[in-house]
Amino acid sequence: MIMSTSTVTLSTPIKTHNGDVSTIVLKEPKARSFFEHGEPFKMRVINEGERDRVEFDYNHKILAKFLTDMCGIDDMLLGGMSASDYFLVRNAATNLIVGVAGTDPLPA
C-alpha cells in the first residue's frame, strides 16, 4: 500500500527546533491517531436538492495532535502558523483523512 501525502507551502515560515520551515509535508494518519486522540472533526452531509454539500465541525485541539502525528512537528510549534496557513494545512489534512487527496487520490 502506498501512503498518501500532501505538501503545503506556508506563506510565512514557522520556527522549529531544526530551523525555519516553509513547507509542511502531511502523511496519511494511522489508526493509532484516532485511538489516542479521538475524532478530529465531525462531518455532516447536507442535502440541498440535486446537490449535497459537506460541513465539518472541527475539534482543533484534537486536530493539532493529528497534525503533529501527520507531519512530525510539535503542536506547540505548529501554533506559530498564521491563521491563513493553518486553514491551508487543516484543509489538506482533512482531505487526507477522508481519503480525497494526496499523491494517489481516489477516483471521482
PLM regions and their residue ranges:
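Short, surface-exposed, charged amphipathic helix/loop patches that serve as local interaction elements
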Residues: I2-A108
